[in-house]
Amino acid sequence: MSTMNTLAFCYGLPNINDITQGIIFVRNNIFYSYLTDYAMEACILNYINIRADKIEDLKKSLVGKTISVRVIRVDVLKGYIDVSIV
């Protein structure tokens, strides 16, 4: 029965290079996207290493907006998803 749950979880993840919609939010100065099609959070790789002053500007312009993102990496075992802005 546990294998059924694991398989069901795997099928709920996006594929690499999929383009989907996400709502942008920030946690601990890291930008994330809530993938509305998959009901999961994904880290946005475009904005991992940026200066603190740029973070504030990006927060003002991006947070709360729905944008298109491309899936870059998926860790099926941990359920982690990394995306980039299209």
From Swiss-Prot:
Name a GO molecular-function annotation: protein serine/threonine kinase inhibitor activity
Q: Which residues form the S1 motif domain?
A: 15-86
Q: Give the record's keywords alphabetically.
A: Host-virus interaction, Inhibition of host innate immune response by virus, Inhibition of host interferon signaling pathway by virus, Inhibition of host PKR by virus, Interferon antiviral system evasion, RNA-binding, Viral immunoevasion
Biological process GO terms, please? symbiont-mediated suppression of host innate immune response; symbiont-mediated suppression of host PKR/eIFalpha signaling; symbiont-mediated suppression of host type I interferon-mediated signaling pathway
Q: Which SUPFAM superfamilies match?
A: Nucleic acid-binding proteins
Q: Hey, which family's this protein in?
A: Belongs to the poxviridae K3 protein family.
Q: State the oligomer form and interacting partners.
A: Interacts with host PKR kinase.
Q: What does this protein do?
A: Viral mimic of eIF-2-alpha that acts as a pseudosubstrate for EIF2AK2/PKR kinase. Inhibits therefore eIF-2-alpha phosphorylation by host EIF2AK2/PKR kinase and prevents protein synthesis shutoff.
- The name on file for this protein is Protein K3 homolog
Which species does this protein come from?
Swinepox virus (strain Kasza) (SWPV)
